[in-house]
């Protein structure tokens, strides 16, 4: 007889075959050779065995069948007719089979079929597609599918976002979906990864399922204890069904060995027990991550994940690990631009808050600030993120002219342009600043002309003397400098040319009334 095995190479001694007599008693059991031949020992007949002898040959189907193996149930009946002609014994052997198939699976009933055909079939390849999202909250829509259509604008969201994570447009995203959006240092992100078992069944011989998530360990902090898994059908927390680890920037979550059962084969192959770990659903993982304070301005924070399925293949007797990626997701920290100018004042010391300066963006005022005591002019930092990509902004800074007539104000208008782009090599948003050539506002203080005045002083004998006149002015004209001379010696004034009412230097009596007339000039 012969043995054929479809699906993989036949091994010597892999299958057993039994020869039985008409009474159903075992005569001999043998195994196949590597080339598929099945050979029993010769049967001998003597003069006492003249007549018809019937035997059957069947494959011995083991109590514990090999996974995926379809055994040939054919029973071949051998009829040996022994006859004697003179002193010579002759035999004629006929074979007829029942319940057998040929290598194409077609029935061979009633034919002289001497070939046992077995077939081993690998398990169906599991069909799955994991998903990945970046959210601003935990436990979002665990039992729903609101996020599924957030990438509908893409032809192939998996290949396109892995090539360029910014390919995802936000206009059709859920509000909780913050993929591609700008985040601040210290913000909490929630990476939600969906492990897909929707199309799995027992026939897949799945030994374990899990996800592998690669995160930017230099830019975000992830703690294994914070990671949770939820059943998308029941909404229950099923974290206890997974072994979760965080090592070297990679998060792994794999179904526990305690979720398995034996297939009952000779190798005691372990597969997932669907009474403990149900298929036909997503297992959604919430992975909280906090943006580190040390992230460089403009830096991309990328995240990607894969789903791995361990499948036992009885054909190769090996474990296969089909794997599929999720979408790649990205966030970025804003890039900042400082607009700083200086103020100088000639003519006197500059005071804090003395002058005002207005900043305009595209000719619209956005902020007005004052100088400090050192002349520094500092506007608030400008932040640029994903929404600014491809844009160029023009800023102008000018001094707000004051009303102090002693100050000459600088009428300079300083122009700064900022061009925002994404550097794919550096994986960062960059702002290219074209600064103003002159960033110093210069004012000059011109003091007023010193007022010219000369007060006068007289001693007269009457009040309201010559109030509207100037008769007294020439009373000291005999002096070269009446102010200096009289301050040194008030008797320097000679009375010969004084008005009669002018009593300066004259003798007066006790009780006399003098009138000091002072002229404010």
Residue ranges and their predicted role:
Residues 1-521:
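Solvent-exposed loop/turn and edge beta-strand elements of beta-rich ligand-binding domains
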């Amino acid at each position: 007889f012969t043995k054929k095995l479809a699906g993989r190479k036949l091994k010597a001694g892999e299958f057993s075959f039994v020869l039985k007599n008409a009474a159903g008693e075992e005569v001999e059991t043998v195994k196949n050779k590597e080339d598929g031949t099945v050979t029993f020992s010769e049967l001998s007949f003597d003069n006492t065995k003249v007549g018809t002898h019937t035997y059957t040959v069947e494959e011995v189907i083991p109590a514990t069948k090999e996974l995926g193996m379809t055994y040939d149930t054919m029973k071949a009946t051998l009829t040996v007719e022994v006859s004697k002609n003179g002193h010579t014994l002759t035999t004629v052997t006929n074979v007829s089979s029942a319940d057998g198939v040929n290598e194409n699976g077609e029935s061979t009933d009633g034919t002289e079929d001497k070939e046992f055909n077995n077939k081993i079939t690998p398990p169906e390849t599991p069909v799955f597609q994991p998903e990945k999202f970046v959210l601003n909250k935990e436990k979002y829509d665990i039992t729903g599918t609101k996020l599924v259509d957030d990438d509908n604008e893409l032809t192939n969201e998996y290949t396109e976002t892995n090539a360029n994570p910014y390919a995802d447009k936000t206009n059709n995203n859920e509000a909780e979906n913050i993929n591609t959006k700008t985040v601040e240092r210290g913000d909490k992100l929630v990476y939600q990864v969906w492990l897909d078992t929707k199309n799995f069944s027992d026939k897949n011989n799945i030994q374990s399922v899990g996800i592998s998530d690669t995160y930017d360990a230099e830019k975000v902090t992830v703690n294994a204890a914070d990671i949770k898994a939820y059943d998308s059908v029941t909404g229950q927390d099923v974290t206890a069904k997974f072994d979760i680890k965080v090592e070297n920037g990679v998060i792994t979550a794999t179904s526990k060995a305690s979720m398995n059962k034996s297939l009952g084969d000779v190798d005691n192959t372990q597969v997932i027990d669907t009474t403990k770990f149900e298929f036909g659903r997503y297992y959604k993982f919430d992975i909280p991550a906090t943006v580190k304070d040390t992230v460089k301005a403009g830096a991309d924070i990328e995240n990607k994940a894969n789903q791995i399925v361990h499948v036992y293949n009885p054909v190769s007797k090996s474990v296969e690990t089909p794997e599929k990626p999720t979408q790649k997701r990205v966030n970025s920290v804003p890039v900042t631009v400082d607009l700083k100018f200086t103020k100088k004042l000639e003519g006197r010391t500059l005071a804090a808050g003395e002058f005002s300066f207005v900043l305009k963006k595209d000719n619209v005022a956005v902020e007005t600030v004052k100088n400090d005591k050192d002349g520094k002019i500092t506007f608030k930092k400008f932040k640029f993120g994903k929404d600014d990509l491809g844009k160029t902004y023009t800023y102008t800074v000018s001094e707000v002219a004051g009303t102090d007539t002693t100050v000459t104000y600088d009428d300079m208008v300083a122009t700064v342009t900022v061009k925002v782009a994404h550097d794919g090599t550096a994986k960062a948003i960059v702002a290219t600043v074209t600064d103003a050539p002159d960033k110093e506002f210069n004012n000059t203080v011109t003091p007023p002309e010193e007022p010219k005045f000369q007060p006068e002083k007289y001693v007269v004998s009457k009040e309201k003397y010559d109030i509207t006149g100037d008769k007294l002015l020439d009373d000291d004209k005999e002096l070269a400098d009446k102010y200096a001379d009289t301050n040194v010696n008030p008797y320097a004034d000679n009375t010969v040319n004084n008005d009669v009412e002018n009593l300066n230097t004259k003798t007066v009596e006790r009780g006399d009334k003098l009138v000091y007339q002072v002229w404010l000039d």
